């Protein structure tokens, strides 16, 4: 019934198994990938024909995590998986990026790649198995695809590269790098690092590409034994006559339009050129008694012509679109403290790209709780990236963040996270929001720069400034040019887009997308060196604006006090049913977080209120010492004495014989409920019961006369 084909290969310390022919047989291609109990089902389906009028390649990649994979039932009312998590969205993008450039130009059939994580070992992230599975499913499907690709994760531990490190190994790794590519070329890199050099980062890319050949070879073996026949697909033949007509009508006008250095003016000129060409071609067709050429086809020819013009100018050493040479960073303007009530803010402008980045400090209660497949965890650092349509002078939908926004936010977060102070040194939760108010390329790197400045403006003690720069590459006939700080148009027209972020000491994040083959290690080396030059220039500008973190937090940020108590006293602070802690937070207006080890963090915008809460907690948890004198309050009267509270929650017996130096006939003659009285603890039994005395410090008559031994003060253990 089943024609099952299995291939396996060793991949670092893991064995990878590829299976096809048993599950999802009606898909164009389906492969089950297993790596040490992490199992991903990769499926591919492609439409046999493109939709009429289709003008772009409709590829969809969906990575889906099933909670049963971890032996769990989904939370929530419906107990069913819902909208994609951030992890699922980011992994979908990770898989999409190296696959998309490998489909042939002109192939507009709809293709859907779906990856289901159906079993998970917490030590093995499913993203690499999913990438390998997607590649294998496409390779055996017969769909036009210039693959397969391989993928690898690379760590860097004790000066050595580690292939596909486990989750435990990654905790001690200085690098978390994912690389994907074909046999001959790297196509995609995504990484974060702890201030590593360009050589170490590039070495990780090369190492990962070398090691992934094992995966590529296994996929070739799978195709040989289980591959379907290749589709009989040919691209539409080019209309050379139309290309010549468009070129003749538009070449000079496009060259002239690209002499305009200002984006909006240039865009207006280009729109006019497009309109003029369409009108001229329609007029020619009408004169010949023919229909006007397809508008989309003409637009595609014009775009290709634009690309040839811009790329040719740059490779010939002419100025770039905005007049710069290949190494110059656009003018930078920085303004700090832009928003008066925000905890920290920075307006970072680089040419026609601008980010308003805002830092907000919160408490442990503000941490993001993430219900991940691997288990629940908390995140104290969040970075949210928003790019509204007005940033590019357009109208559009505003609502749920799109995949691009989530991806850009994660890249900026990767760049900054390793520079954050240790949690024990700075216990605040940090949220950064990057509002892109103008965009003409490199907005994610503007978010990195603005994020570093906003946190320092908020008083977050970052280890160092972090800057990012987006680079581009144009390669043609053996000639190449690396472009520093690319514009949006240069991103679309170039062959490689890579973003590098880091400090003066090294790289903290690297993202690379390569659209063509033939980019060598040497070219990447030149590109990384030029990126370092640009990054150091930007860091210099940032230091001119703000040398380091401000010494004090914003007046509107919560103040935190930390005290340490005996863990056995936690119940005294919480009280029965949480009554004590609830009353304490409500009466002082503070937030109080209690850890199991007895660490208590008190947060309040009003420092005086925080100190009041601290004082009351110290009182609640103070130990009563025999021989110490305390200011007490009479709780109730007995025939033979009184019950006196010496500290919150601690009271003792004041016997009638220990009140005065004379005989008392009636307790009501000397004490009343609520009366303040100074007492000395003269005994505590093994059950914690206290015996008190007033007589031992002079008697009630002395206190009434105004003289008594001073009371003990509970010791604060504030850190």
UniProtKB/Swiss-Prot annotation:
**Would you identify the family this protein belongs to, as annotated?**
Belongs to the polyribonucleotide nucleotidyltransferase family.
Alphabetical list of SMART domains matching this protein: KH, S1
Q: Output this protein's name.
A: Polyribonucleotide nucleotidyltransferase
Gene3D superfamilies the UniProt entry points to:
GHMP Kinase, N-terminal domain, K Homology domain, type 1, Nucleic acid-binding proteins
* Primary location recorded for the protein, binned into one broad class: cytoplasm
Task: Work out whether the entry's keyword set contains Cytoplasm.
Answer: yes
GO CC annotation:
cytosol
The gene is pnp
Fetch the Pfam families from UniProt.
KH_1 (PF00013), PNPase (PF03726), RNase_PH (PF01138), RNase_PH_C (PF03725), S1 (PF00575)
Q: Show where the S1 motif domain sits.
A: 627-695
Q: Which GO terms describe its biological process?
A: mRNA catabolic process; RNA processing
